[in-house]
Amino acid sequence: MIKDNFFNNLFIFICDFMIECRNISKGKAEGELIVSSEAISFLGGVDPETGVVIDPNHELKGESIKDKVLFIPGGKGSTVGSYVIFQMMKNNTAPKAIICLKAEPIIATGAIMSDIPMVDSPSSVEELVNGQMVEVDSDNGKITLL
């Protein structure tokens, strides 16, 4: 009985740190979250050579998204943004994974072309804060807080 309660409580504890989401682009990646409340345009908004946000009006201006897990509401701007994401992958300046509140075709296409795991529609967002380490497992539709 004690053993059963222990494992049941452990399961509940672990599940509290998993967030369900929808798979957009296959894969699994782990990294530090960089969070923005603003949509981002990859064309003209992010330098594909460095992975630094260069849009002068964006709250992440000057921040690098290279090797981070990017959490944004969605994307905006030109369809060329998909190719900017692809160029970032080729330059090793892309984010490790992308989480969106609602995916849109530009970023989704870029993530798929670049083999960047991407999910959207997280069941909870309060835990997703700057600096939090997470694992995005889009194959199984979950984000795990580490």
What spans do the regions from the language model cover?
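Short beta-strand-to-coil "C-cap" segments at the C-terminal boundary of structured domains/repeats
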Residues: 144-146
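N-terminal amphipathic/basic-hydrophobic helices that include classical n-h-c signal peptides
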Residues: 1-17
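Feature captures the catalytic cores and cofactor-binding loops of soluble hydro-lyases/lyases
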Residues: 19-29, 33-142
